[in-house]
Structures are given as C-alpha cells and as structure tokens.
Amino acid sequence: MASCGPSNALQNLSKHASADRSLQHDRMAPGGAPGAQRQQFRSQTQGGQLNNEFQQFAQAGPAHNSFEQSQMGPHFGQQHFGQPHQPQMGQHAPMAHGQQSDWAQSFSQLNLGPQTGPQHTQQSNWGQDFMRQSPQSHQVQPQMANGVMGSMSGMSSFGPMYSNSQLMNSTYGLQTEHQQTHKTETKSSQDAAFEAAFGAVEESITKTSDKGKEVEKDPMEQTYRYDQADALNRQAEHISDNISREEVDIKTDENGEFASIARQIASSLEEADKSKFEKSTFMNLMRRIGNHEVTLDGDKLVNKEGEDIREEVRDELLREGASQENGFQSEAQQTAPLPVHHEAPPPEQIHPHTETGDKQLEDPMVYIEQEAARRAAESGRTVEEEKLNFYSPFEYAQKLGPQGVAKQSNWEEDYDF
C-alpha cells in the first residue's frame, strides 16, 4: 500500500540506494586528489577498524586499545552510574587503572538495570540529599558525553542515549520520591490537624456534660432552684387571689349601686301615691333589692339562697296586672251612665221627596251653579270666575288625600259629560 502513494520514505530510500555514483567514485584518486585523504579515512580507516572490532567481538578475542578499560572505565563507571556516596543511584565497582580485559566481557557484565539494593531514605534530610545530588546529576550528562565520544567512536551512536536514559531514570526517581515524601508529609500534617480539632471538640463537649452533671449533683443548686419555683408559685397564687378579690369587690360595688337605685325608686313611688303602690309586686321587689335580700348576678336576680327569682317575679307581675285590669273594668261599668232610648222618626220625615223613603241625589250641575253664585256674592266676582275656581268634592279629596296635592284645573276639562 505504501508504493501506491505518489512519494514516500521507502521510495526515496530506494532511489537513493540505486543511484549510480560510479563515475563520481572513479574521479576520486586513492591518494592524490584533494579529497583522497578524507575518502581514504572514511572508506578504509574507519571501516577497517569497525570490521576488526567486530571480528574480535565474534571471536571473543582481546579488545582493541581504543576500548581499554583505562580510557572509558573512570568516566563510564563513576560518572554514568553515579558517585559511590549516592544511595539512590546504581553503583558499579570501578575497574583498576591499566587492567587489560575483554571489552565484550566487560560490557556483558555491566548492570544496566536499576540496583535493587537497600535504600535508606530518611524523611528528615531528604531535602539536603536532593540538593547535594542535584549538581552531580547535572554534571553527569556532559561528562559522559565527552568520555564516551573520546574513548569509543564506534559506540558513539548509543553511548549518549544510554547516558541520557540513566540520567532521566535517576532524576525521575528523585522527583517521584520527593513527590511521594511531600504527599506523605502533607497527608500526615492534615491528619494531625484533623485529630487535634476533633480532640478539641470532644474535650469541649465532655467539659460541658461534666459541668451539667456537677450542677445537677450540687444539692445547694437544686435547693435554690426549688426555692425559686416555690416563690414563683406563691406569687402566682397571690396574683390570682388578688384578681378574685377585685372581681368580688367589683360585684359588690355593682350590687351596692343597684340596691341604692332600688331604694330611691321605692321611696319616690311611696311619696307619690303610697296607697296605690304599697302592695304592688314591683314595690316589694325594689324593697328586697334595697335591703340586699336580692342581688344582681350577671343578668340574674338571685336571693340569699342563690336561686334565680326572675320567673317568680314575672308570674306575680302578670297576675297583678290581670287583677288590676278586671278591677278597672268593673269600676268603669259601675260609673258609666245608662243609654237614652229615642223613638225613631217616621220614614216620611226622613225622606220627604220619596214615598219609599229613598232620597235621590241632586244634579251636580245645579249644585255647581248654586255654589258658584253663593261664592260670587260673597267675593264680589262673577259666577264664571267662581266656576273656574270651584273644586268638586273629588278634587278636594285628591288635594287632601295621602297621595299628594292634585293639580288645579277646570272640572269641565276633567269631567266632560
């Protein structure tokens, strides 16, 4: 699928590899051209050295002088794997100076992984260790780069990468340890603060409860409280008694005023007509109220036994009124004059114009003429003028009736025959 595209990395690489550069190589002389020495170094010296080293590695023969441990051991062993006094970084025993050994065997014996030895990390001086190790960690990378590049040219491609990876692992380990330690200390401080606050709350609650128990256990305090309660109860009873006495006094005053009014009424009636009201029920009631034999209780009349006498007084008043009415009627009958009987006149005297005794009504027009003439003679006006001002009995009834005054008009217009 990659070859289907217009241009990719594989096609560019194949084009670059298949390009014919034979003419360019022929123009370069092995030893006379200006670039011959450089080409000879690139094609023969470096290539031959790499081939020899590879053959020695395959045959497990002695290493080349450029891979001597004396040249790369101090830099590679001490700078790359850390100083001996650093506990967090891996340590490797340095090789003795001048010792000739197989570089392949030495390389196979290298411990590229992290050391699993015991690490004694103290939380108290982790900041000092980190500050002491930080400058050394920053110096590892340039020293390793210079040492490896100067001592072994063939391993220049992976030497810096290995050094950088080791430095990154060491730095990451220190940072992780620092973060974990910081988190642990923060959590510990938070837990300690929470426990202290919780303990203070518990202590305050305990003190409050203990104080309440002490107050409850104190007999003097309980006695004082009981005395206060008794004093309040006595005060409440005293207030209620005062209120009751005031109510009784008010009732007594009302009954006294009522009795005085009753005595005044009785005395005034006795002075007016003693013989008439002396034995009346009303006068008897007023005397009893004035002598406090009957008192007023709300809307009731109560005797000394506490019985309501309103019904009794009402019945006595009704009987007395009925007897008085009967006495008045009998007295009136005794003093009334006897009726006088008259003989009725004969019918012809009552109705002289009729034989049957029925008197006929006069003609209204004749009555009006006669009445107008009489008024005209008295007032000095003409008869016609009097006719205009004449009111019939019906008109007088309308004027003086309960419906109001009727309008004045000529009777001929209203009663047109």
From Swiss-Prot:
Motif (WxxxF/Y motif 2): 126-130, 411-415
Ranges of biased composition (kind: Basic and acidic residues): 17-28, 340-361
UniProt subcellular location: Cytoplasm, Cytosol; Peroxisome matrix
Annotated phenotype, changing W126G: Slight mislocalization of the non-PTS1/non-PTS2 acyl-CoA oxidases (Aox) izozymes. Does not afect import of PTS1-containing proteins
Low complexity composition-biased segments: 71-92
Post-translational modification: Monoubiquitinated at Cys-4 by PEX2 during PEX20 passage through the PEX2-PEX10-PEX12 retrotranslocation channel: monoubiquitination acts as a signal for PEX20 extraction and is required for proper export from peroxisomes and recycling. When PEX5 recycling is compromised, polyubiquitinated at Lys-15 by PEX10 during its passage through the retrotranslocation channel, leading to its degradation.
Any one Gene Ontology molecular-function term assigned to this protein's record: peroxisome matrix targeting signal-2 binding
Keyword Repeat belongs to the record: yes
Bias kind Polar residues: ranges: 1-15, 37-47, 323-336
Cross-link (Glycyl cysteine thioester (Cys-Gly) (interchain with G-Cter in ubiquitin)): C4
Record keywords: Cytoplasm, Isopeptide bond, Peroxisome, Protein transport, Repeat, Thioester bond, Translocation, Transport, Ubl conjugation
Annotated function: Coreceptor required for the peroxisomal import of proteins containing a C-terminal PTS2-type peroxisomal targeting signal, such as 3-oxoacyl-CoA thiolase. Acts via its interaction with PEX7, promoting association between PEX7 bound to cargo proteins and the PEX13-PEX14 docking complex. PEX20 along with PEX7 and PTS2-containing cargo proteins are tranlocated into peroxisomes by passing through the PEX13-PEX14 docking complex.
Protein name as annotated: Peroxisome biogenesis protein 20
Organism (species): Yarrowia lipolytica (strain CLIB 122 / E 150) (Yeast)
